[in-house]
Amino acid sequence: MGKGTLKKFVITVIILEILIGAIYYGYKKLGTSSDGTSNLSLKDKIVTTLYKKIAHEDLEILDVMENKAMLYYAYWNIDDKETINCEVVDVKEDGYTCDGLVTFVKKNDLEKAVKNLYGKDITVQVESFEVDKKHYAVYDETHKGVVVFSKEDNSSPINIKLKSAVKDEDKILLKTQILDGIYGTVKETYQYTFVKNGKDYYLTKKEKVKA
């Protein structure tokens, strides 16, 4: 290879590197707004993992750090729930019934789920709480866990839809829409804030925002 040819080759490589760098930078800028935040794909692995933690919502809870709210979210993030026979349950709850085998969640499992969702330093007092409009988790001190009672309720369930995901430094913000069960119209729009601590993201906040 002659000196002239070598020089042209080197120049070509440099130009290609500059072009590739410019394309990459431009691509990154497309997903980054002027305030430094960047949009994430709704199919992003972290986004889908975090959304799964709050996608079961069937109650209009706003203060996610409130004790009963933490238990509610923890309950829906426990995949392997046990059952218990209502005949051995000592507690009762007005308006709710317990018959045959029903869902039972140990106190320790709820506490563990709270830490997985909110952070290792978060503590919770296990008590009775609403699971959804038709079910109530009643704490049974004898069996050290909650027993899920049920009741009749004809109201439509709340449908939740993920609208957007944004990364803001050490935070990931998920914006969701609450849809009318019949017409599918947007009733409310909420934003969930997950803050990174170590390798994991933990739920810290929920607020009403504009659509």
Model-found features: residue ranges?
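N-terminal Sec-pathway targeting helices
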Residues: M1-I18, G26
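Mature, Sec-exported extracytoplasmic domains of Gram-positive
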Residues: K29-A211
